[in-house]
């Protein structure tokens, strides 16, 4: 048979009395270590520590931009050959040939000079003669298109520039050489009460003023 256990109050008082200490005050409760252990229950096992995670450092890099193609080279590159289809080469086709032909015609257009030559005879006025001088480039083998060529072909040597002698007049009045008379514009003025006519003649060498008697001007006109 088991013996009855003393109450918690009696057990708490017993050790104090045995040790000779002062009695506990009334109304004070002393906890029993055994009872506290029984009241708390069995001890729980120790909880493991928190897990440690090892993180590998990662460096973020911006995305690489796509490289743009280099700009197309224009003209002739340094130390290289000219690219095909580019540059200042001669254009092929009818339009390019027509443009070059028009440019050649503009540069090699004939230079026309009109000169009035008067083959004078004593007491007779001849008809003015119109001469045309055409200047062409020596590099051209033929006349430019659209022009009419008169006289010898391109293989014949061109005559040299110089004094041109007029053809001799037919008949007994023919001479070895006849002077060439050139017509210049002339303006005449007659003063009041004067028998002379003041004439102003303009020539390439200058302007001349001379007086001519009235009877000579009447005969001439």
Curated annotation (Swiss-Prot):
Pro residues bias (residue ranges): 63-72
Species of origin: Homo sapiens (Human)
Family classification: Belongs to the PRR20 family.
GO molecular function annotation: identical protein binding
InterPro entries in the record: PRR20
One Pfam entry name: PRR20
Annotated region described as Disordered, given as residue ranges: 1-103, 137-174
Low complexity: compositionally biased ranges: 42-53
Name of the encoding gene: PRR20D
Residue spans of biased composition, Basic residues class: 75-93
Name this protein carries in UniProt: Proline-rich protein 20D
